A protein has these predicted regions:
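A late C-terminal transmembrane helix in Major Facilitator Superfamily
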Residues: 160-195
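C-terminal transmembrane helical hairpin of 12-TM major facilitator-type secondary transporters
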Residues: 106-152
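Symmetry-related core transmembrane helices of the 12-TM Major Facilitator Superfamily/SLC fold
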Residues: 14-34, 198-220
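Extracytoplasmic gate region of multi-pass secondary transporters
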Residues: 53-92
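Transmembrane alpha-helices of Major Facilitator/SLC transporters
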Residues: 83-107, 111-119
């Protein structure tokens, strides 16, 4: 996706299309090498959500959409390689903190920290989007993304009943990609946002709504349905 956003400045469109097709071919080849040790259910109907969407985890999944939507909007409005690396650096720091502390055991605090850090990064980006401030913003957004997405994934893995975790993880991946691609499409199209500043303001709004929705509904839903 990042290559697609920044590729036209490096390669002509036809070569980008050939590159995309080649990567799709590599993906298809690698998929054929995957061996699944479980037998698929027999006598399934023509249309089925089995192994595709788990409705029990849909509410946390919809709440989780705020994370990839914000990330997609920001990446579409800020085509800077060092900014992307700063986001990756923030996420790596989250992984280290997760191993060294017990903060991951408190989901409510984890999501709160994640959204607040993301908000801080967006505000910095809104005020100054160049120089050291840009890298600090990317680091905060990456760190906040790690905190938020870490707990949302944990919820979607713990909520399923027996033998449903694969479907739940598939739901997580589907919603993550849907949110990211939708955010890119909306931000790049120009139908909703005409300037980068408007994109950042929209991302701030999405972040606030995601935090409030978690505190008011998702956290309570998880406590009521966990291990039922």
């Amino acid at each position: 996706m990042l290559i697609g956003l920044n590729g036209p400045s490096m390669l002509p469109i036809p070569k980008l299309l050939y590159l995309s097709s080649a990567l799709c071919g590599c993906s298809a080849f690698l998929i054929t090498m995957v061996q699944v040790c479980f037998r698929a259910p027999l006598d399934l109907p023509l249309c089925s959500f089995d192994r595709f969407i788990l409705f029990r985890t849909l509410l946390p999944g919809l709440n989780m959409l705020c994370v990839p939507i914000v990330l997609g909007m920001v990446l579409s409005a800020m085509p800077d390689a060092l900014f992307y690396l700063s986001i990756v650096g923030g996420f790596i720091v989250y992984l280290l903190l997760r191993q060294l502390s017990s903060i991951s055991q408190n989901g409510k605090l984890q999501v709160f920290l994640g959204q607040v850090l993301t908000l801080a990064g967006l505000v910095v980006l809104l005020v100054v989007d160049s120089g050291a401030h840009l890298h600090a913003s990317g680091f905060l957004i990456g760190l906040g993304t790690g905190f938020s997405i870490g707990h949302f994934l944990q919820m979607m893995i713990l909520l399923p009943m027996h033998c449903e975790r694969g479907t739940s993880y598939q739901t997580f991946q589907l919603l993550w990609q849907l949110g990211f691609v939708a955010a890119l499409a909306i931000a790049v199209s120009g139908f909703v946002f005409s300037t980068s500043r408007e994109v950042y303001e929209g991302a701030i709004l999405v972040c606030i709504v995601g935090l409030l929705f978690y505190q008011l509904y998702t956290c309570r839903y998880f406590k009521e349905h966990y291990q039922q």
